[in-house]
Amino acid sequence: MEIRFLGHACFELSDGDTRVLIDPFLTGNPKAAVEASELEPSAILLTHGHADHLGDTVDIAKRANCPVVAIVELANEIGGNGVEQVFDPNIGGTVKFDWGWVKLTPAWHTAVTPSGTPHTPAGLLIGIGGKTIYHLGDTALFSDMKLVAHRGNAIDVALMCIGGHYTMDRLDAVEAAKFIEAGTIIPCHYDTFPPIETDAEAFKSDVESETSSKVQILQPGETHST
């Protein structure tokens, strides 16, 4: 299993046969590692529809003819924009594929698309390649994060926002790390723009001194193997 960080909150998960793309904000992203036109995903998963997460979803999905998974109101808008394969779960809902599954989890944030569609933001619990990956989405710290790993879903890798201002900051993210108890944490949603600049190395030091989790800091374009 490989996890490639593409900048901001965008990741590509690959088990060798399948490539799953999360929150493909590439065009207009000063930290983007690739052009949207370079990607051929098997599926696109969205945490929510703010411009820095929805990004290039529609263009990529149309070109690659791949499904998009998003919460129901956001999925309806994407389908209305010409994407043929759209899956529309709500919080707590699971969608299964031949490569694995994705479940929408709560996230504390706001969400409205650039065209004005309000919807509920989500986190993503993903099963792929025999691993469980938790992308927290944009969120504040909240205690129900403890429940995400219930029913034996131990988190192998957490993709965690740490930038503050629009989401929890690195100090709250340390508390989130204690709740989630992931094997590895990859920080994201920081340093893309001035309001979310932070010290990722300090986050790594705090997490590794206060929890059993390891932190892998990736630069855009770098890959973590698990």
Question: Where are each of the predicted segments found?
Answer:
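Short active-site oxyanion
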Residues: 1-2, 62-67, 131-133
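Zn-dependent metallo-beta-lactamase
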Residues: 1-19, 26-29, 96, 103, ...
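Pre-active-site segment of Zn-dependent metallo-hydrolases
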Residues: 12-50, 55-59, 73, 110-115, ...
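Active-site neighborhood of phospho(di)ester-bond hydrolases with catalytic His/Asp-centered motifs
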Residues: 21-23, 41-49, 69-72, 134-139, ...
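Active-site environment of divalent metal-dependent phosphoester hydrolases
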Residues: 28-29, 50-55, 75-78, 93-96, ...
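Glycine/small-residue-rich loop that forms an oxyanion/phosphate-binding "nest" at active or ligand-binding sites
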Residues: 55-111
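Binuclear metal-ion centers of metallo-dependent hydrolases, dominated by the metallo-beta-lactamase
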Residues: 67, 79-93, 151, 174, ...
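Active-site-proximal loop/helix segments of hydrolase catalytic cores
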Residues: 112-179
